[in-house]
Each structure stands twice: as C-alpha cells, then as structure tokens.
Design a protein with these regions (language model features):
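Non-catalytic, beta-strand-enriched accessory regions in extracellular/secretory proteins
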Residues: 1-8
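Secretome/extracellular-domain signature
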Residues: 33-131
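Extracellular trypsin-like serine protease catalytic domains
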Residues: 133-162, 166-174
C-alpha cells in the first residue's frame, strides 16, 4: 500500500497472471473488520504495455483508500478495493477488482467480508444490515454503496452501523435501530 497507483510495464510479450487482495475493514474494540476479497485472472500483454495497480487501504490506518465508506463518530472506514486498470485511470478502466471488507459497527461483531464476485453482508441483529456489492449492483443498507464506493456507516443515538467496503460496486453501509443499538 502506498496511497497512490503504481505502474507496471510488461517486460515481455505473453500471458500474465494477475492477483489482487482487497483491504480489511476498520476495527474497533475486540472485533476486526471484514477481511478483503481475492480475485485472479490472466491477460495477454504486449511488451511495454502498461497496467495501473491500485492497492486498497485498510479501514483504520489508511482510511479505506480506493472506495471504503466512512463510519463517522468512530473515524474508521470500510476497506478499500484493490484493482488493476488498463488503458487509463478511471473506474471504468478496471480489469480486475478485489473488494474491501466492511468495517465493524459495534465492538462485538465482525464486518462483512470483501468479495471477488460477491461481498458478504454485515453481521448483527439490530438495525439495517448492509449487503455486499456484486459485479452488477451495489450493496444496499442504510446508506447503499455505489459504483466503486462503499456506503457510509451511521453513528446515531450512541450506536454505530458499519461502513461498506469498496469494490466494482461497493458494499452497503449498516444503520442502527431507534434505540441506538449497534448494527454491523
């Protein structure tokens, strides 16, 4: 992780295996955020062809760089996606994506895991649970994810709802119930 993209220039013409691991969501208390997902694929590259590598930031120290949603009040984030892009720097140039894990909401349940194909949903028994993003739609929740971005978590009535991780489509952010009970 560097906080910026890195450039890879193919040294020879041939088939390359690409791998990416999404970042872990932010932790609080005794529980960790969801683990990041894993993706792999192969691509044919000509000598000198350029790929842009984005390594997602974890949800605590690196603020969910590359799409992790924010959990206000706790200042933690969902994990950022890790991806590889070809032909440019935009989200539409991504050719391989591994989703970041969701942040913890409460201190008693882990966040949802990041996906390769589909991310995991939040864990808990109160409020609105965030669902994982997929290749075709963002995760839903109290605040839904969007293209490339996890939904924000919620801090209300002294309760926390976890933030979604980044991905092709980001995971949804969780909410809290009316009494402020934590959701994950």
């Amino acid at each position: 992780y560097t906080g910026s993209w890195q450039k890879f220039i193919a040294p020879t013409t041939g088939i390359y295996t690409l791998e990416a691991w999404g970042a872990q969501g932010g932790h609080r208390g005794n529980n960790n955020g969801g683990k990041g997902g894993y993706s792999t694929g192969q691509i044919f590259l000509n000598r000198g062809q350029i790929l842009y590598v984005y390594v997602g930031g974890d949800g605590n120290n690196h603020k969910g760089y590359n799409g992790g949603g924010l959990l206000p009040g706790a200042n933690i984030y969902g994990g950022g996606a890790s991806d590889i892009r070809s032909g440019g720097y935009t989200l539409n140039n991504r050719i391989l994506v591994a989703g970041g894990g969701g942040s913890v909401g409460s201190s008693s349940n882990a966040g949802g895991y990041g996906g390769g194909l589909t991310g995991g949903s939040g864990n808990g028994s109160f409020g609105t649970l965030g669902t994982g993003g997929t290749q075709t739609q963002a995760g839903t929740g109290n605040i839904s994810g969007s293209f490339g971005q996890g939904g924000n978590g919620v801090y209300a009535n002294s309760g926390f709802g976890g933030a979604g991780g980044g991905g092709w489509y980001g995971g949804g952010g969780s909410g809290v119930d009316g009494g402020g009970d934590d959701d994950r």
